[in-house]
Amino acid sequence: MADARPRILYVSDLAYPARGRRYCDEDILLTSRLRAEFDLALCHPRDAAALMDAFDAVVVRNSGPVLGYRAEYDAFRERALRQGTRVYNPLTGRADMAGKQYLLDLSAAGLPVIPTVDRAEDLHRLPGADRYVVKPRLGADSIGLRIVTRAELPALADGTVLVQPHVDFAYEVSFCFVDDAFQYALYAPDPARRWELVPYEPTVRDLEFARRFIDWNGLRHGIQRVDACRAPDGGLLLVELEDLNPYLSLDALDEDRREAFVTAFAASLHRFLDDVPSR
């Protein structure tokens, strides 16, 4: 008799409205392929905590901004950690999964990140700029983002927001990794249309930059996306390290790279199930 196949609860908000893209198409593709190797069911993020006990692992994919279901996500996270539920990506991520504090920490440590502070007494640490970006610490997808002048900052920097100089970057670029292996890079040639991505061939220095943050985060398993911008001096600055539910923009890849990613994803899931003990 054949061994039972691993049971995967795949978490996705198929109806999430995203500007310029359809998140659901990506998860329809991935689940259709993963079913060849796993017994798989999809669920909405609000239902994950109630359903996860019947599965060998939970895979969190395009589940939308946690801000929209904070209580349910916190309950899922607390229960999964308490029970030892296998969650992919593992819940030990130090970047977006844990909030935006890492941007403050990395900035204070002098790493190549857009300079970031959250309090009025630290505004002197920001470089001079014509405009500044203010966004909620718990925000996502540019929700609540404001562009303001320096004179407005003291009244806004109260610890609940992040403050950064507005960088006139040449373009944004994203580097996708599965576990610690680089998969592909995409960039938006037109900063005004940042959701329109095309393949990007990274240099050795680009990959060294991206891998520095992957190594810092320390996740042995999972999908991570390093988002950066090309600063006026030609260097890269980290915008965010998405380690919770990064959108992958697979539709922007050619068939060979897309197939390579699907293969790497499935192999990573098998390693995860083999390496991480079940509860």
Which residues fall in each region the model found?
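Flexible loop residues that form catalytic
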Residues: 13, 63, 121, 137, ...
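C-terminal active-site "lid" helix and adjoining low-complexity regulatory extension at the edge
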Residues: 230-279
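Short amphipathic alpha-helical segments and helix-helix/interface helices
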Residues: 27-31, 73-78, 103, 123-124, ...
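ATP-binding N-terminal substructure of ATP-dependent carboxylate-amine bond-forming enzymes
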Residues: 1-86, 274
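A conserved helix-loop-beta module that forms one wall/lid of the active-site cleft
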Residues: 74-147
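Short amphipathic alpha-helix with an adjacent loop that forms part of the alpha/beta core around
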Residues: 47-54, 78, 123-128, 152-155
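A short beta-strand motif that forms the metal-chelation/ATP-contact edge
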Residues: 55-60, 135, 175-177, 184, ...
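Phosphate-binding site of ATP-dependent enzymes
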Residues: 141-237
